[in-house]
């Protein structure tokens, strides 16, 4: 599909609830992605990451209320890197224009022929999962050779663009090195508190709405559809040394049933340093490209009464080609099949005491595909319906030391159903701001109909709702402006039976 720079590199609205340090971490992650794309000679994504970095440093971070008062070294360092980024953008601009023009010509020719460009997987041996709107699915023969595809610059967003050169020029015109302190009017426009700041009248939830977790009986029965597995896994050892039953891989791996393989092989990830002369000096990781399975989630869930719980029903997974105008184009994310069951075993003692457990998902990027390679169990405080991580800096230290991207989080609902509460949505908002591809995995072992789900905030609908919500604790949310669900099942996630990962328990 055509690349619209106004959307794939759009300005990020500042949220003063997010610490300024986290915004600089977002900038560092963008440069790390750019470093990987530079090494892989991926000019299109390299250009987009550099453009996002430029926008973040010049158009978002300076409007944070703590920008002038804190982190002076980060402020000076980011401005120095911005100069190098703009110089590289200028040098890449002609080649980027040529590649984009070529992509657009190919698409135009395809449309004239009356055919659509295929959805291309950026990993070899990928198994295409049927579109979410199809009512019935057929299971492939796992003994047949898996289809392969070569890396392509086809983007899976439903975007339209006029002149990409005009968009590029407009992006450059926005960039400036002279960051003057913003006046009060500017701050009020960019503040999540609105023009009235702290004086704004808080809107309390309606008194007749009672917010609580639903019981399992609130869910109606659903005809669960399964996932297509990528084929038998190679032999692997479990975390505790037990042998595996290969036959379980021949069952349907569904996010709506509980038949996951129980163990995983814990293997330390291999890392390499960027050998090229990179002014940003970030470390990339090399990972294998095993056969994935698209994490399609059944979408016909029985509706929960709105009086019982806030945001009870997620939206269905929307394939990229059917995405809404202005939505993000997410890069694929591979999740180890066994990581969910292993997490449940690690959380068993808390679950038996009706306490939630949470973990942080982190991993690598290779060939436009994110891979979850590390499950971090942080120090935490738990209740029956909440879980709070402690010592966030320790988590950041692990991610930085191992050069890992923050790819989301996972947590349990010991006795509740599988859904995202209002507290969960606010928690995931911080992850998705850090990286749009980040996911939230919910494990509900007592929910027989939907024991697990992989979700994220809809963008821009859900992200906007949570950004503008100033309430805390369990509360209902206003409906999004376009009427779309606040959160939805992920369409960019693949379950990978061969992906290896390690567990770091910091408790």
UniProtKB/Swiss-Prot annotation:
Source species, domain of life: Eukaryota
Localization per Swiss-Prot or TrEMBL: Membrane; Cytoplasm; Vacuole membrane; Late endosome
Alphabetical list of InterPro entries matching this protein: JAMM/MPN+_dom, MPN, STAMBP/STALP-like_MPN, USP8_dimer
Record carries keyword Lyase: no
Main location as per UniProt: membrane
Pfam family for this entry, one: JAB
Residues that bind Zn(2+) 1: 411, 413, 424
PROSITE patterns: MPN
Domain (MPN) ranges: 333-463
Site entry (Indirect zinc-binding), positions: 356
Gene3D superfamilies assigned to the protein according to its UniProt record, in alphabetical order: Cytidine Deaminase, domain 2, Phosphotransferase system, lactose/cellobiose-type IIA subunit
Keyword flag Endoplasmic reticulum: no
Region entry Disordered, spans: 133-162, 214-242
CDD domains named among the record's database cross-references: MPN_AMSH_like
UniProt-recorded name of the protein: AMSH-like ubiquitin thioesterase 3
Organism of provenance: Arabidopsis thaliana (Mouse-ear cress)
Upper lineage: Eukaryota, Viridiplantae, Streptophyta, Embryophyta, Tracheophyta
């Amino acid at each position: 599909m055509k690349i619209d720079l106004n959307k794939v590199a759009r300005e990020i609205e500042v949220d003063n609830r997010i610490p300024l340090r986290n915004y600089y971490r977002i900038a560092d992650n963008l440069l790390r992605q750019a470093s990987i794309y530079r090494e892989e000679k991926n000019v299109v994504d390299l250009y987009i990451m550099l453009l996002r970095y430029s926008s973040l440093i010049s158009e978002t971070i300076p409007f944070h209320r703590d920008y002038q008062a804190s982190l002076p070294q980060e402020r000076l360092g980011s401005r120095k890197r911005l100069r190098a980024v703009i110089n590289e953008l200028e040098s890449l601009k002609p080649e980027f224009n040529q590649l984009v023009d070529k992509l657009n010509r190919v698409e135009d020719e395809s449309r004239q022929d009356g055919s659509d460009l295929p959805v291309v997987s950026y990993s070899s041996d990928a198994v295409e999962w049927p579109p979410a709107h199809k009512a019935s699915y057929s299971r492939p023969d796992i003994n047949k050779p898996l289809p392969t595809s070569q890396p392509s610059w086809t983007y899976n967003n439903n975007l339209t663009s006029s002149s990409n050169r005009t968009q590029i020029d407009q992006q450059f015109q926005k960039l400036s090195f002279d960051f003057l302190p913003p006046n009060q009017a500017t701050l009020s426009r960019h503040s999540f508190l609105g023009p009235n700041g702290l004086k704004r009248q808080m809107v309390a939830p309606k008194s007749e709405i009672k917010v609580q977790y639903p019981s399992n009986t609130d869910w109606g029965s659903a005809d669960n559809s399964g996932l297509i597995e990528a084929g038998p896994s190679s032999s692997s050892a479990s975390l505790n040394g037990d042998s595996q039953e290969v036959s379980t891989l021949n069952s349907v791996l569904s996010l709506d049933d509980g038949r996951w393989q129980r163990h995983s092989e814990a293997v330390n990830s291999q890392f390499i340093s960027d050998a090229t002369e990179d002014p940003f000096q970030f470390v990339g990781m090399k990972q294998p490209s095993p056969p994935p399975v698209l994490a399609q989630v059944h979408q016909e869930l029985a509706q929960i009464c709105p009086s019982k719980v806030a945001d009870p029903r997620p939206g269905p997974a929307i394939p990229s080609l059917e995405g809404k105008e202005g939505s993000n184009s997410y890069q694929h994310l591979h999740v180890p099949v066994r990581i969910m069951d292993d997490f449940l075993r690690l959380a068993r003692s808390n679950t038996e005491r009706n306490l939630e457990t949470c973990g942080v998902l982190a991993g690598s990027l290779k060939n436009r595909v994110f891979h979850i390679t590390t499950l971090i169990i942080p120090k935490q405080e738990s209740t029956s319906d909440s879980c709070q991580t402690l010592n966030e800096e320790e988590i950041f230290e692990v991610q930085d030391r191992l050069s890992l991207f923050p790819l989301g989080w996972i947590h349990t609902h010991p006795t509740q159903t599988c859904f995202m509460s209002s507290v969960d949505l606010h928690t995931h908002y911080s992850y998705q701001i850090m990286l749009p591809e980040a996911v939230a995995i919910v494990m509900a072992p007592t929910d027989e109909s939907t024991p697990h789900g992989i979700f994220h905030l809809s963008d821009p609908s859900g992200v906007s709702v949570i950004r503008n919500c100033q309430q805390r604790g369990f509360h209902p949310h206003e409906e999004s402006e376009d009427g779309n669900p606040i959160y939805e099942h992920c369409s960019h996630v693949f379950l990978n039976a061969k992906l290896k990962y390690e567990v770091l328990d910091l408790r």
